Structure formats: structure tokens, C-alpha cells
Amino acid sequence: MQEELFESQKIVERMALETLVVDVDGFEGPLDLLLNLSRTQKVDLRKISILDLAVQYLVFIEKAKELRIELAADYLVMAAWLAFLKSRLLLPPDPSEDGPSGDELATHLAFQLERLQAMRDTAAKLMARDR
């Protein structure tokens, strides 16, 4: 029983290490939550400092060198999407642009967030399995 508790505690600690928690301009929480809130327009991206976000990402990567590179890549994709969405907000719209609409970008971002959550859930299940 204590071994199971110890193993569960190790899983929780590892998951905490694998979560990028950002603290930028009045928001503190996981990066995927920030993206979700920005997608639903509950956080104003114009107030988020991309520089602070990038610095915190680099610090996270330095601390997480022993973690899987796929995890770092997922967070890089999320940070890049956040920067891209913010740039789309700050720049005037180009009527001749054939790129994706804001709704299409938000849908793609939601898909990426669902994919990341599915990977996390699967990783937790695999870590919790009996060996």
C-alpha cells in the first residue's frame, strides 16, 4: 500500500515538473490554460508580454533537460501559437491575405490543446500501470 502511495506521489511530482507554469502580466498558471483562456477571449493577449513568456520557457527547458524532448516541443508549439495569435491581434488585418481566419486558428489551437491533454492522460496511465 505504501509502495503504491509512493509511486503515485512520484507520478504527481513528475507531472508537476512537466507542466510549464507561466507568470506573465497578471496571469499565473499552466501555459495550456493561458492558451485556452485566450482562445475563449477571457484573457487579453495584448496585455501578455511575449518576452516574459519566452524567458520563462527557456528557464523551463533548462530545468527540464532530463525530460522528454517531445514535451518541450509541445510547449514550444503552444508558445509559438500564442505569439502568432498576439501578432495577429496587434497588426492591422490584411484584406489580400489568404491565410487562415481567426476562427480557423482557434480551432487548430483547441485541437493542439486536446492532443496535449490526451498525451498527458496516456502518460499518467502508463506511469500508473503495474510493472
Residue ranges with predicted function:
Residues M1-R131:
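Long, charge-dense, low-complexity tracts
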